[in-house]
């Protein structure tokens, strides 16, 4: 087995430094207060192309022969790896072909083209695009750059650990997102080489915990399916070449539910004014799972490439889950002035109305009652309960409406 050595990591760090930002650690007062630790973020969401992937891609290219460079590179990806390879190839003066699924959003296709790569659309899912990329590699003699299962790529990603330990030599814990394991392999292996006392914790989505399951079984296995909003780490099978390094160097694996990622997104936007993609938020959500205090912890924010529609959906879901937006249904007599009474009550309780829906057909006898659905903003759960209690005391028999349209009795 090829070995990852300190010499290779040092070489990679010097080479990668030529083309990447040395993203400086950001101290988080908010999360430090929340957890009782000193929390720092390694903001690779601020990196060129919006993610760490350029590090591994650029170092991988540097290890190729002139003949291999002349023939060109190929990879398959619908996300950050595509842009990382395209950008690294452009800087290296090497032709790159990126195979993307036909379902890839146009903005990602255009960004990849913008870095100078030739984009080929093939297959409906990543596996089909990847198979086609291997076929083209065989036909044209291209070098295939794997998104994670490549030790040179992992060595390049390890430059992140070099920067962390250089800036914060006394770091106690490093939290690393895991998809296929390339980033975690590089970071954990170098961290242990530099200081074996550093704890490295891998973080996976609960719905795509292929590394955790593989570690339990003692060998690489394939999940039957994955289900997570963290699409960048939605991997069924971790890297075969990487697995021994994860076994040796990762101290623990934490898994994160999608709802926790939604909360983490809101926390980062509101407290740090930063956009971090769902996979990068894994290490933010994991902070609350660490049963330690007074430790120096670095969470790696692996990327920040999120489309606006996804962002909007996550914000909405987050506000709903934190009871800062809710809908309540009340029944009113169908006569003038009733709506004004409800509005006056809500104003007194400082509820901010977003939307009103008036339904006269809730009852066969509309004179008996009409339904008013009120969607409003609140400051949180206590404030929401205060508003609902006020409606109850006024005789309106409120029912909370779930956003799928079902009722919740009070």
Where are these regions (language model features)?
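PLP-dependent amino-acid enzyme catalytic core
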Residues: 1-410
């Amino acid at each position: 087995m090829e070995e990852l050595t300190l010499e290779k990591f040092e070489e990679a760090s010097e080479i990668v430094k030529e083309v990447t930002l040395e993203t400086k650690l950001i101290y988080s007062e908010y999360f430090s207060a929340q957890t009782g630790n000193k929390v720092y973020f390694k903001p690779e969401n601020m990196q060129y192309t919006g993610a760490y992937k350029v590090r591994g891609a650029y170092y991988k290219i540097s290890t190729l022969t002139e003949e291999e460079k002349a023939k060109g590179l190929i990879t398959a990806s619908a996300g950050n790896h595509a842009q990382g390879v395209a950008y690294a190839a452009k800087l290296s003066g090497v032709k790159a072909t990126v195979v993307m699924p036909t379902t890839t959003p146009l903005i990602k296709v255009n960004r990849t083209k913008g870095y100078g790569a030739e984009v080929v659309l093939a297959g409906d899912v990543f596996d089909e695009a990847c198979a086609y990329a291997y076929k083209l590699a065989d036909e044209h003699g291209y070098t295939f750059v794997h998104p994670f299962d490549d030790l040179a790529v992992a060595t390049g990603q390890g430059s992140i650990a070099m920067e962390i330990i250089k800036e914060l030599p006394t770091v106690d814990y490093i939290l690393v997102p895991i998809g296929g394991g390339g980033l975690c392999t590089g970071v954990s292996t170098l961290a242990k080489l530099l200081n074996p006392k550093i704890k490295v914790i891998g973080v996976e989505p609960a719905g795509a915990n292929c590394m955790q399951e593989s570690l339990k079984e003692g060998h690489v296995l394939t999940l039957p399916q994955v289900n997570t909003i963290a699409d960048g780490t939605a991997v069924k099978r971790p890297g075969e070449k990487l697995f021994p390094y994860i076994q040796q160097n990762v101290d623990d694996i934490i898994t994160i539910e999608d709802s926790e990622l939604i909360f983490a997104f809101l926390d980062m936007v509101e407290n740090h004014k930063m956009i971090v993609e769902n996979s990068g938020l894994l290490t933010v959500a994991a902070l609350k799972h660490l049963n330690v205090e007074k430790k120096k912890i670095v969470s790696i924010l692996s990327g920040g490439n999120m489309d606006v529609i996804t962002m909007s959906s996550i914000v909405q879901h987050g506000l709903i889950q934190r009871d800062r937006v809710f809908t309540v249904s009340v029944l009113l007599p169908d006569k003038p002035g009733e709506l004004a009474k409800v509005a006056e009550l809500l104003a007194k309780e400082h509820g901010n109305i977003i939307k009103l829906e008036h339904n006269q057909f809730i009852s066969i006898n509309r004179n008996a009652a009409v339904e008013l659905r009120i969607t409003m903003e609140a400051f949180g759960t206590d404030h929401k309960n205060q508003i609902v209690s006020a409606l109850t005391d006024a005789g309106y028999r409120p029912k909370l409406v779930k956003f799928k349209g079902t009722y919740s009795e009070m």
